[in-house]
Amino acid sequence: MAAPSGTVSDSESSNSSSDAEELERCREAAMPAWGLEQRPHVAGKPRAGAANSQLSTSQPSLRHKVNEHEQDGNELQTTPEFRAHVAKKLGALLDSFITISEAAKEPAKAKVQKVALEDDGFRLFFTSVPGGREKEESPQPRRKRQPSSSSEDSDEEWRRCREAAVSASDILQESAIHSPGTVEKEAKKKRKLKKKAKKVASVDSAVAATTPTSMATVQKQKSGELNGDQVSLGTKKKKKAKKASETSPFPPAKSATAIPAN
């Protein structure tokens, strides 16, 4: 259904005149304002834009414009509710035709996995075997250590356990060694030892000074003892001579040996 030709020509002429005015305004705005003056319009030489506008008014286009259509682009004159209803029906119809088969997916996955395992990586040499790295990296089962029945092994294990074991008392002792109280105690002990050493040195010097006098006294005592022994021997001989004279009837003859010299 086409509109009458008179209404179309009037609307096109009004649109072309408004377009020409907009072009003139844009040109005036684009001209620089400094050092240049706008040239006056020449009446004898019309512009190309004016000629084009005249041609457009004299020869209207035969194209069908949707915006100027009476039905405004909606030839069926449908409402949005009707369009939504049709879309829902079409969606349900498509869903009914589409079927999902789960059994067909499983073999496809298995094939993809097999292909991936076979084509995994690349061969560096012609002798290299694909998948050899995975076999090497597979963890080997560890063998359990058999308990040793010998006494030497048990003694060694017990000794290692003792070396590795740390008791709470050991930790406390180590912490006490580095504490400030222990440092003060050690300093006091060192002072006492120094005092004792000084006392011993003074005693030794005193003993060294008194040794010559003590040696002299000891020598005197020894000489006195020797003299006393000699006197005791002379007295014993005198007593024996007296007893012999008393027992014998004849008077003893005087001899030099009988009378000891004092």
Curated annotation (Swiss-Prot):
Phosphoserine carried by residues: 61, 138
Family listed: Belongs to the CUSTOS family.
Basic residues bias locations: 188-199
PANTHER family per record: CHROMOSOME 12 ORF 43 HOMOLOG, PROTEIN CUSTOS
Role this protein plays: Plays a role in the regulation of Wnt signaling pathway during early development.
Localization in the cell: Nucleus envelope
Protein name: Protein CUSTOS
Alphabetic keyword roster: Developmental protein, Nucleus, Phosphoprotein, Wnt signaling pathway
Region (Disordered): 1-79, 126-262
Compositionally biased region (Low complexity): 9-18, 200-209
Record PTM Phosphothreonine, positions in chain: 79, 182, 211
Residue positions of motif Nucleolar localization signal (NLS): 236-241
Superkingdom as given in the UniProt entry: Eukaryota
Organism for this UniProt entry: Homo sapiens (Human)
